[in-house]
C-alpha cells in the first residue's frame, strides 16, 4: 500500500499520493479562485494583465483573466478550462463558476480529513447538484413572457453591471437586445438567435454612448478603387478566399528563354491567368466581389468597366459570416475536377443592397437585406484600444445572456438570491438523508453562500450581516406560504440592504445558474477523484558520443 507523501519511482519520476496530492490540488484551485474573486459583482475590481511582449489587457472578465495566466498546476488548469467552457456555453458567470468550484473543493478536503471517503462526497455532491437544478426550475425561476421585453433588457443590464459599460447599461441594454432581435431566425417552428451574425466593430474617438447599431452586416473595408460604384442594388456577391494578384511561377521553377522577345509573352500570360479568372466570376453574374487576398491594380480596370464593386483584404471570419447570411459559398479555388477553372452562378450570395457609407469617422461597407439570414452590426466608440477591447468583451457577454433568455425564456433573480435559496433548501434536504451523503450535501449547501459573501465584501459591506439577513428572508419564504414573495430577495450593493431583485430588475438567465452549478460540481468532482500524481522527469537527450558506444 502506497504511503502518503513523495516516493521516487523506478522510472525517474516523482510520485505524490493520498492526502498530500489532494491538499496540493485544493491549494492550487483556491489560488486560482482568489485571483478572480475580487472582480465578482457590480462593484468588482479590474485586473491589469501584461504579457511577455508588453501588451496590456485591463478586464474583469473571469475567462479572459484566466486565459492570460500561464497556469502550470494540472488542477489549476482544470479551473481555467472550466471558465472557458462557461464562457462558450453561456457567455456570462465565468468568475462565479470558478469561485464555487474552488469552495466545493475546499469543503470536500475538510470532509476527507474527517475520514469521509471521497466516493461518498462525490455521490453527495452529485445528489445535491441534481436536487438544486430541479429546485431552480420548479421554484425560483419564472418566464420572461410574464414581464415582456423589459425582462430581456434587464438581464442584459445585469450582465453589464460589473463591466466597463455598467454606467451606460440603460443605453447598451436596449442596443444589445435590438441587435439580437435583428438576427432572429425561425426554422421549422424553432426560433434561434445566432449572435455570431452580430458583427462588433471598434472605432476610436467619441464616447461610449455614441456607439451605434447598424441594420445589416458592416465590413471594416472600403472599395478597391474610387472609380467603382459605391452603391450596388440587388447585389450578387462572390466570396473568394484567394488572391486576384498577378499569377507568379512557384519558387524552384525555372524557364529557359533563348529569345528575349518571348519574355513579354510570359509576363502577359501571368497577367492573363488572373484576367480570365475575373472574367469567369463576372460572367457568372457577380456584381460585388469580396476577397481575403489582394487585387492587382491592373485587374481593377475590369471591375470598373463592368460596373462591379470589389473589396480586397477582408477578414476570413467576416467572409464566412457574410457567406452564411447571403447564401454564398466561400470559394477557395476556381479549379474543377476536370482540371479546368470555372465559377458557377450558384456560388453567389444575394442581398438587397451593398453600399459604402461613412459612419462616425470611418468608411464602411454595409450589406443590407441579406437573403438567407438577417444581420446586424454594433459599432463601438471609445477612447483607446484597452477600453474598446473590454467593451467588446462586455457586449459579447451581454449578447450571450440575451440569446439564452430569448431562447429559454426562463429567468431567476440575481444578487445572491438563487444561491441563498438553494443553500437553505439543501440544508433542509440534507437532514432527510440517513446516509453519509448527508455531510456532503450540507457542505455543498454552505459552499453556495460564498457568492453572496464575496458580492457583499467586494462592495465594502459587512458580508456576515447581509448574508444572515438574506438567509432569514429566504427561510421565511420557504417556511411561510404567505411570505413566498420573499424568495426573490437579493442584495442591493449600492445601499447595503436586502431588496426584491425581481422588482428591481436584477435578473439572470436560469440556464446560466444551472450550467454554472453543473460545471462547478463536475470540475470539483474531477479534481476530488485524484489521489495519485506521478510527474515524470524530463529525459536527458543522449550525448553525441553515446551513439558510437
Curated annotation (Swiss-Prot):
InterPro entries: Chap_CCT_alpha, Chaperone_TCP-1, Chaperonin_TCP-1_CS, Cpn60/GroEL/TCP-1, GroEL-like_apical_dom_sf, GROEL-like_equatorial_sf, TCP-1-like_intermed_sf, TCP-1_chaperonin. GO terms for cellular component: chaperonin-containing T-complex; nucleus. It comes from the Eukaryota. The keyword Repeat does not apply. GO terms for molecular function: ATP binding; ATP hydrolysis activity; ATP-dependent protein folding chaperone; unfolded protein binding. Keywords: ATP-binding, Chaperone, Cytoplasm, Nucleotide-binding. PROSITE patterns: TCP1_1 (PS00750), TCP1_2 (PS00751), TCP1_3 (PS00995). SUPFAM superfamilies: GroEL apical domain-like, GroEL equatorial domain-like, GroEL-intermediate domain like. It is found in: Cytoplasm. The keyword Ribonucleoprotein does not apply. GO terms for biological process: protein folding. Belongs to the TCP-1 chaperonin family. Heterooligomeric complex of about 850 to 900 kDa that forms two stacked rings, 12 to 16 nm in diameter. Molecular chaperone; assists the folding of proteins upon ATP hydrolysis. Known to play a role, in vitro, in the folding of actin and tubulin. This is T-complex protein 1 subunit alpha.
Amino acid at each position: 500500500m502506497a504511503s502518503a507523501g513523495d516516493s521516487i519511482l523506478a522510472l525517474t519520476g516523482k510520485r505524490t499520493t493520498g492526502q498530500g496530492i489532494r491538499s496540493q490540488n485544493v491549494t492550487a484551485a483556491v489560488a486560482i479562485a482568489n485571483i478572480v474573486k475580487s472582480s465578482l459583482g457590480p462593484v468588482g475590481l479590474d485586473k491589469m494583465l501584461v504579457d511577455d511582449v508588453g501588451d496590456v489587457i485591463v478586464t474583469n472578465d473571469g475567462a479572459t483573466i484566466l486565459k492570460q495566466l500561464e497556469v502550470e498546476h494540472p488542477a489549476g488548469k482544470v479551473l481555467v478550462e472550466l471558465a472557458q467552457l462557461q464562457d462558450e456555453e453561456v457567455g456570462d458567470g465565468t468568475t462565479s463558476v470558478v469561485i464555487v468550484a474552488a469552495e466545493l473543493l475546499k469543503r470536500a478536503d475538510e470532509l476527507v480529513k474527517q475520514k469521509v471517503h471521497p466516493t461518498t462526497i462525490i455521490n453527495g455532491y452529485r445528489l445535491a447538484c441534481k436536487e438544486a437544478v430541479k429546485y431552480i426550475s420548479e421554484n425560483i425561476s419564472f418566464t420572461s413572457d410574464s414581464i415582456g421585453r423589459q425582462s430581456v433588457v434587464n438581464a442584459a443590464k445585469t450582465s453589464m453591471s460589473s463591466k466597463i459599460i455598467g454606467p451606460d447599461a440603460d443605453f447598451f441594454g436596449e442596443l444589445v437586445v435590438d441587435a439580437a432581435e435583428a438576427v432572429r431566425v425561425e426554422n421549422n417552428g424553432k426560433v434561434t438567435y445566432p449572435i455570431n451574425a452580430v458583427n462588433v466593430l471598434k472605432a476610436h474617438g467619441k464616447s461610449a454612448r455614441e456607439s451605434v447599431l447598424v441594420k445589416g452586416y458592416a465590413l471594416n473595408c472600403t472599395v478597391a478603387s474610387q472609380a467603382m460604384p459605391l452603391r450596388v442594388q440587388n447585389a450578387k456577391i462572390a466570396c473568394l478566399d484567394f488572391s486576384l494578384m498577378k499569377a507568379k511561377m512557384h519558387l524552384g521553377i525555372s524557364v529557359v528563354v533563348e529569345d528575349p522577345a518571348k519574355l513579354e509573352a510570359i509576363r502577359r500570360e501571368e497577367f492573363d491567368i488572373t484576367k480570365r479568372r475575373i472574367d469567369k466570376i463576372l460572367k457568372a453574374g457577380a456584381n460585388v466581389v469580396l476577397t481575403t487576398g489582394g487585387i492587382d491594380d491592373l485587374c481593377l480596370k475590369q471591375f470598373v468597366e463592368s460596373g462591379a464593386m470589389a473589396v480586397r483584404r477582408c477578414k476570413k471570419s467576416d467572409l464566412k459570416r457574410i457567406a452564411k447570411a447571403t447564401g454564398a459559398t466561400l470559394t477557395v479555388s476556381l479549379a474543377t475536377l476536370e482540371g479546368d477553372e470555372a465559377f458557377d452562378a450558384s456560388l453567389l450570395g444575394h442581398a438587397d443592397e451593398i453600399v459604402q457609407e461613412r459612419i462616425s469617422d470611418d468608411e464602411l461597407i454595409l450589406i443590407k437585406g441579406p437573403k438567407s439570414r438577417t444581420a446586424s452590426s454594433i459599432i463601438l466608440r471609445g477612447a483607446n484600444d484597452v477600453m474598446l477591447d473590454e467593451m467588446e468583451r462586455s457586449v459579447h457577454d451581454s449578447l450571450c445572456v440575451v440569446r439564452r433568455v430569448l431562447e429559454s425564456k426562463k429567468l431567476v433573480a440575481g444578487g445572491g438570491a438563487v444561491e441563498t435559496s438553494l443553500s437553505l433548501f439543501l440544508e433542509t434536504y440534507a437532514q432527510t438523508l440517513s446516509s453519509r451523503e448527508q455531510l456532503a450535501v450540507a457542505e455543498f449547501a454552505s459552499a453556495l453562500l460564498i457568492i453572496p459573501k464575496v458580492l457583499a465584501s467586494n462592495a465594502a459591506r459587512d458580508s456576515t450581516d447581509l448574508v444572515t439577513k438574506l438567509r432569514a428572508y429566504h427561510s421565511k419564504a420557504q417556511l411561510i406560504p404567505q411570505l413566498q414573495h420573499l424568495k426573490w430577495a437579493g442584495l442591493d450593493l449600492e445601499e447595503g440592504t436586502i431588496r426584491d431583485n425581481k422588482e428591481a430588475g436584477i435578473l439572470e438567465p436560469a440556464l446560466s445558474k444551472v450550467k454554472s452549478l453543473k460545471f462547478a460540481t463536475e470540475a470539483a468532482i474531477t479534481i476530488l477523484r485524484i489521489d495519485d500524481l506521478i510527474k515524470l522527469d524530463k529525459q536527458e537527450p543522449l550525448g553525441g558520443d553515446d551513439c558510437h558506444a
